[in-house]
Amino acid sequence: MMDRDSADQSSADSTPIEPPHSNAPSGPVVVSVCTTCKTADGSAVVGPEMFASVRAALGVGDANVVVRPVQCLSVCKRPATVAVTSPDGYTFLFGDLQTESGTAALASFVKSYLKSNYGLVPWRERAEVLRKGMVARVPPMRWSPDDGLAPK
């Protein structure tokens, strides 16, 4: 288990992270960064800066992670907004992210996401900025509606 200090730190190395077991998310983790987010008072667009920062932190060329710009995640009252998802994993939507602290937290979160069952990073292992900025956690598409338990 990762302690909180290591969960709040990130390393920008370019070594691909391999999922350790079959319940880890398959396919790439997709990090979608809203590029139309503005400051709360609407005076400045902060999305492009967040996108550039997240892309730099997570690296380019890692087949396990894709960072993409999106025009709107419809969480306009909580800029900057970022979604993290994978084909068979949970989707997380975070808001209220500042470029520096949010980027470091997201880099650490994505590494943990890749190693967690279905991308479900335990709450206590998430950086405080992500715990406070949580907008939504959506279960994987293969979620069982009959019993509500995690996919098997």
Which residues does each predicted region cover?
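Ferredoxin-type iron-sulfur electron-transfer modules in oxidoreductases and energy-metabolism complexes
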Residues: 47-65, 96-101, 106-109
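Intrinsically disordered, low-complexity regulatory segments enriched in Ser/Thr/Pro
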Residues: 91-95
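Immediate flanking context of iron-sulfur cluster ligation sites
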Residues: 20-32, 51, 55-75
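Generic structural "secondary-structure junction" signal
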Residues: 75, 96-99, 132
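Local cysteine-cluster metal-coordination motifs and their immediate loop/turn environment
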Residues: 29-44, 69-86
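Polybasic, low-complexity association/targeting segments
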Residues: 3-37, 146-152
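Short flanking/linker segments adjacent to small metal-binding domains or redox-active Cys/His motifs
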Residues: 78, 83-89, 107-152
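Short, charged low-complexity linear segments at domain edges
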Residues: 2-18, 42-61
